[in-house]
Amino acid sequence: MSEDVRLVAWVRGQVQGVGFRWFTRARALELGGMSGFALNLGDGRVQVVAEGPRERCEGLLEWLRGDDTPGRVDGVTEIWDTPRGGYEGFAIR
């Protein structure tokens, strides 16, 4: 079993107003074992915070960078950290 981690990703491109946060939540729930949120930022990016097993978070990051996301992703910047907890489920903020 892999260690639990915290993934914080900032997704840029045409990612607001296209259902991106909803689909991100759906993908996180489909992968399972993660908690966190997806949030629209004022500069047009979407911030995704996910905590859970490393392989699940890596799967979510791979999806964020893939061609199956709604809208258009121009790039994803991520940082990895230790989990902080405090999330229940995966929310859209």
From Swiss-Prot:
What are the residue boundaries of the Acylphosphatase-like domain, all occurrences included? 6-93
**Which residues are named in the active-site annotation?**
21, 40
The answer to keyword Membrane applying to this record is: no
An example of a Pfam family matching this protein is: Acylphosphatase
Is the Membrane keyword given for this protein? no
Catalysed conversion reaction: an acyl phosphate + H2O = a carboxylate + phosphate + H(+)
Q: Name one GO molecular function term.
A: acylphosphatase activity
Any idea of its EC number?
3.6.1.7
Q: Which UniProt keywords apply?
A: Hydrolase
* Chain ranges passing through the membrane: none
Q: Which family does it belong to?
A: Belongs to the acylphosphatase family.
UniProt-recorded name of the protein: Acylphosphatase
What organism does the record attribute this protein to? Streptomyces coelicolor (strain ATCC BAA-471 / A3(2) / M145)
